[in-house]
Curated annotation (Swiss-Prot):
Its EC number is 1.1.1.18. The lineage of its organism: Bacteria, Bacillati, Actinomycetota, Actinomycetes, Pseudonocardiales. One of its GO terms (molecular function) is nucleotide binding. Keywords: NAD, Oxidoreductase. This is Inositol 2-dehydrogenase 2. The gene is iolG2. Belongs to the Gfo/Idh/MocA family. It comes from Saccharopolyspora erythraea (strain ATCC 11635 / DSM 40517 / JCM 4748 / NBRC 13426 / NCIMB 8594 / NRRL 2338). GO terms for biological process: inositol catabolic process.
Length: 339
C-alpha cells in the first residue's frame, strides 16, 4: 500500500524531504505540495513526478487524496498546520520546533488527547542516526554502567543573518536537548546557560556562542557547547560517560587523504551530509508507522518537553541563574521515556 503524502514548505528542508521520499523511501508517494513561493512549489512538484500544487496549505491538508502530511514551512506556522492535521485525523511529520512556545506545543498535545491517539511526529532526526542509535544500544546494554555525564558539541559553519540569537537554543541546541532526553531516558529538571566570549565573526547584536548545563531527574549532568560561526564546517560530536566506561560519538567515516606531508579528511558544510541517513531512516519509519497508525519517533509530547527545557535555558540567559524546567504532568497517551 502506498501512502500519498502532502508536503507544506518546499524550501531547504521541504525540498530535501521531497527528494528523499521520491527516491529513497518505500511505500511513499509525494502527491501534493504547497509553498508560499508558487514558483518554488511548481519546481518541487516537478521533482516529485507530477505532484499537484496546492495554493492553500489547509486545502492540501483536507485533500481526500492526501493520506499524511510533512510540515517543513516557517517555524511560526507549525502549530496551526499540526493542529489542522490532527483535526483531519492525518499523520503529520512536523519539522522542529513543533511550535514557537511550550504553551503552543501543549495545545497540540491537548488536541491529540481529545482525538484519543498520537498523530504527530516531530522532526528530531538524531533519534534515527546510526551512531546515536548505537550509543543508546550500548548504554541500554549496561556495558558501561549507569550514565553519569553527557558531553555534546554542536557547531555550524554559519547561521542565517535574520535569526535572533535565541535561536541558538530554540533552533540549534534543542536537538541536543531532545537527544539527551532520549538517550538517557530521563527528563531534564534544571538548566543553566553560560555566555562564552563571542566570536569576531558575529554581528554586533548576535551572540554566536552558548554553553548549557542541564541536570536530569536522576542527577546526570549534560553539557552542550553551541557555536554557529565555526567557519571550518558542520561538526556534531559527543561523549557519554558511564560508571564503567564511555562512548564517544564522532563524525561518520569519510575518505582520508595524505598529500605533501599532510593527512586530512573533509568536513561537512552543513547538517545534510552528516545526517542524510538519519533523515532517510526518519522518513521511512514515519511512513511505515503511519500505515499502521503508530508514531515511532519523537511525539508531540517530546516536542513540548524539549521546548520547555529550551525556555528554561532562555530564562537562565536572561537572569544569569539556574532555572527550573516547568513541565506539565505527562498524559497516559504518550509512552514514558525508556531509561
Amino acid at each position: 500500500m502506498t501512502m500519498n503524502i502532502g508536503v507544506i514548505g518546499c524550501g531547504l528542508m521541504g525540498a530535501d524531504h521531497i527528494r528523499t521520499l521520491t527516491t529513497a523511501v518505500s511505500g511513499a508517494r509525494v502527491a501534493a505540495v504547497n509553498d508560499a513561493d508558487e514558483g518554488r512549489a511548481a519546481g518541487a512538484a516537478a521533482e516529485a513526478e507530477g505532484a499537484r500544487v496546492h495554493s492553500d496549505p489547509f486545502g492540501l491538508i483536507d485533500d481526500a487524496e492526501v493520506d499524511a502530511v510533512v510540515v517543513a514551512s516557517a517555524d511560526e506556522t507549525h502549530e496551526e498546520f499540526a493542529l489542522a492535521c490532527v483535526r483531519a485525523g492525518k499523520p503529520v511529520l512536523c519539522e522542529k520546533p513543533l511550535a514557537t512556545t511550550s504553551e503552543a506545543c501543549l495545545r497540540v498535545v491537548e488536541a491529540e488527547m481529545r482525538g484519543g491517539r498520537p498523530l504527530v511526529q516531530v522532526g528530531f532526526m538524531r533519534r534515527f542516526d546510526p551512531s546515536y542509535l548505537e550509543m543508546k544500544r550500548v548504554l541500554d546494554s549496561g556495558r558501561i554502567g549507569r550514565a553519569l555525564m553527557l558531553h555534546s558539541v554542536h557547531r555550524n559553519a554559519g547561521y542565517p543573518p535574520a535569526l535572533p540569537d535565541s535561536a541558538l537554543i530554540t533552533g540549534t541546541g534543542v536537538h541536543d536537548i531532545d537527544i539527551a532526553r532520549w538517550l538517557l531516558g530521563q527528563e531534564i529538571v534544571t538548566a543553566t546557560a553560560h555566555t562564552p566570549r563571542r566570536s569576531g565573526l558575529a554581528r554586533p547584536d548576535f551572540q554566536d556562542t552558548r554553553f548549557l548545563v542541564l541536570e536530569t531527574e536522576n542527577g546526570v549532568l549534560v553539557d552542550v557547547e553551541i557555536f554557529v560561526n565555526a567557519g571550518y564546517g558542520y561538526d556534531v560530536r559527543g561523549e557519554l560517560v558511564g560508571e564503567l566506561g564511555s562512548i564517544s560519538l564522532h563524525p561518520p567515516a569519510t575518505l582520508t587523504t595524505r598529500y605533501e606531508g599532510l593527512e586530512g579528511r573533509p568536513v561537512a558544510r552543513d547538517f545534510r551530509p552528516r545526517f542524510q541517513d538519519a533523515y532517510r531512516n526518519e522518513l521511512q519509519a514515519w511512513v511505515t508507522a503511519g500505515a499502521s497508525g503508530e508514531v515511532r519517533g519523537a511525539t508531540a509530547w517530546d516536542g513540548y518537553a524539549s521546548a520547555a527545557v529550551a525556555e528554561a535555558c532562555l530564562h537562565s540567559v536572561a537572569t544569569g541563574s539556574t532555572a527550573p524546567v516547568e513541565i506539565a504532568p505527562q498524559p497516559a497517551l504518550y509512552a514514558p521515556l525508556a531509561a
